Design a protein with these regions (language model features):
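Transmembrane-lumen/periplasm boundary regions of multi-pass, lipid-linked membrane glycan transferases
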Residues: 179, 190-289, 303, 356-362, ...
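Transmembrane-helix motifs of polytopic, lipid-linked glycan transferases
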Residues: 30, 94-115, 153, 157
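Membrane-interface transmembrane helices that cradle and orient dolichyl/undecaprenyl
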Residues: 112-115, 154-170, 276-284
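Short helix- or helix-capping micro-motifs
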Residues: 33, 124-130, 177, 181, ...
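Transmembrane-helix signature of polytopic, membrane-embedded enzymes
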Residues: 3-4, 16-17, 25-30, 107-130, ...
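Signature aromatic-anchored transmembrane alpha helix within multi-pass, membrane-resident enzymes
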Residues: 330-371
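Short hydrophobic alpha-helices at membrane interfaces in multi-pass membrane enzymes
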Residues: 157-178, 209-213, 217, 294
């Protein structure tokens, strides 16, 4: 009989694992959550919208059970934010910030479930708070801001069950997993790794519970609408992943993939999460939770073998940080090293604070450029666009409003009789999203584009007799239009290279109606 099964039969022992100081630490965890909120809010309006945020807002105007490149939840969050809180950067970014703050608090709670005291809880939560990648992904509306919350909630529920809570809690696991699938399909990777981890760690007996299978059915039912949408649309996510690996993502070796984990989480936090992994495998106390260690290794292997982006495993690390907090607490307690109990957290905090500007835009651009020149290793690239002056995360926050202004100038110079029939065709969803967000105040119509879900939404009712096109190669335009005139150029010194020196064309005399040539503008990536 496994150790976890024994614990399930002995709730008193499971309760005894929770230290008496657990309640006393709650105000300190709350303080860390407040610190997380303060840091994120400090940079909420410093730069502009991130490229994907503009796209998600456009998706929120076309609510559906699926999109070419994502499940429906992120579009729904965008719609809710704008309708409940207003059409501002603050409203769009509030929910991801709250999700990130919840992950900080939940990490401390998971450390408690692992049997950790004050030090374990605070150390794990602090590590999650200060990890540069967590700060970055929680700074803007993104599926990546919510994914750690879904993974961590599932882990917390599972650990509670292992510690003796009612197996009925598996139903909550199913709900969380189902919602996670509607956020990002990589929840499937977590689910597979979690199940395999239970089997490899000797906890496969948990599958004998009817509740875990009911939970699986709940998750499937919640996922089913998006699954049906995918099937009806020819599984576009498969095409997106295949094209991104071939044309967009940086190709890196497994060694570089692993090295990026260290940078994303901060090198000073490496001993903590590695210690957490070791605690799961090598200690008596961690044996009950070995399934989480196996699941992490499987997640890592799957993403490396699938040539995924190196940040894909990041949602898993709060679990290892919580376990690492317990391992560190046990180490300093067993060896009576109080100085280490102070020194390591202090060094970690100092190092983490030093890298906050790489995750949250708290500094003006000029100041950040000077500051970051001394720490170039933290400017990690995940896409194959040439390097620009700013890290990719920040570069994609510049140029959008200016782009809309330039297009507006061009649009309003079109003769009035022709203007009402003139379409605005953007080369990618960021450009189209910028027109859709800033355009109403500038008197612009909604944009069209062949990129991802914009392609699915079609050319609206435009004939193509007059089209303002930017972000598409000139040779493609001359192939389909008899008259192609460059009338402006869009650029921004801090934007991504792909948004530098973008020509703006007015195209007329199409060879065929726009609906006919529309498939040639398709770009699924």
């Amino acid at each position: 009989m496994s150790a976890a099964k024994v614990l399930l039969q002995n709730n008193a022992f499971a309760s005894a694992l929770r230290p008496e100081s657990a309640r006393a630490v709650t105000p300190l965890l709350a303080a860390l959550v407040a610190a997380k909120l303060a840091i994120q809010f400090a940079g909420i309006n410093q730069y502009g919208f991130f490229r994907d945020e503009l796209y998600y807002m456009a998706c929120g105007e076309h609510l559906a059970w699926g999109y070419i490149d994502q499940p429906p939840l992120i579009a729904l969050v965008s719609w809710l934010a704008r309708h409940l809180l207003g059409n501002s950067m603050f409203s769009i970014r509030l929910f991801p910030i709250l999700a990130g703050a919840t992950v900080v608090g939940l990490t401390g709670m998971l450390a408690w479930e692992f049997g950790g005291g004050k030090l374990a809880q605070l150390l794990g939560a602090t590590a999650v708070l200060l990890a540069p990648a967590n700060l970055a992904f929680d700074s803007f509306l993104s599926m990546n801001a919510f994914e750690p919350l879904f993974w961590l909630l599932c882990a917390w529920i599972a650990v509670r069950i292992v510690n003796g809570a009612s197996p009925v809690l598996w139903l909550a696991f199913g709900v969380v997993a189902g919602l996670g699938l509607e956020n990002k399909h990589s929840m499937l990777v977590f689910g597979f790794a979690f199940a395999a981890g239970l089997i490899l760690s000797g906890e496969g007996w948990l599958f004998k519970s009817k509740w875990i299978w009911i939970a699986a059915m709940i998750a499937l039912l919640l996922f089913l609408p998006n699954l049906i949408w995918e099937a009806r649309h020819g599984w576009p996510q498969v095409e997106v992943v295949r094209n991104a690996q071939r044309l967009k993502n940086v190709s890196i070796s497994p060694l570089r993939f692993l090295f990026d984990q260290v940078l994303f989480l901060h090198p000073l936090e490496l001993p903590l999460w590695l210690g957490g992994l070791a605690w799961c495998f090598l200690t008596v106390q961690g044996k009950r939770f070995r399934f989480l260690g196996w699941a992490y290794l499987i997640v890592l292997f799957l993403f490396i073998s699938m040539h995924g982006k190196s940040y894909y495993p990041l949602p898993y690390y709060p679990m290892l940080m919580a376990a690492g907090g317990v391992a560190f607490e046990r180490l300093v307690s067993a060896r009576n090293r109080r100085s280490l109990a102070v020194a390591f957290p202090l060094i970690m905090v100092i190092g983490g604070v030093a890298t906050i500007p790489f995750g949250v835009p708290v500094l003006p651009v000029a100041t950040f450029l000077r500051y970051s020149s001394g720490l170039p290793m933290f400017q990690v690239r995940v896409e194959s666009d040439p390097k620009v002056s700013l890290p990719q995360l920040y570069a994609d926050m510049f140029g959008w409003k200016n782009m809309a202004n330039v297009v507006s100038d061009v649009y309003h110079k079109i003769p009035a009789g022709e203007r009402s029939r003139c379409a605005i065709l953007a080369g990618n969803y960021g450009e189209a999203g910028a027109i859709d967000y800033y355009g109403p105040k500038l008197g612009l119509p909604k944009a069209i584009s062949g990129h991802n879900s914009y392609f699915d939404w079609g050319p609206r009712n435009y004939t193509g007799e007059c089209v303002i096109i930017f972000g598409d190669p000139t040779e493609q335009l001359t192939k389909f239009f008899g008259e192609v005139e460059q009338v402006a150029t869009i650029s921004n010194p801090h934007a991504m290279d792909v948004e530098q020196n973008v020509p703006v064309f007015v195209c007329r005399k199409p060879d065929a109606p726009l609906a006919t040539i529309w498939p040639h503008f398709k770009m699924i990536i």
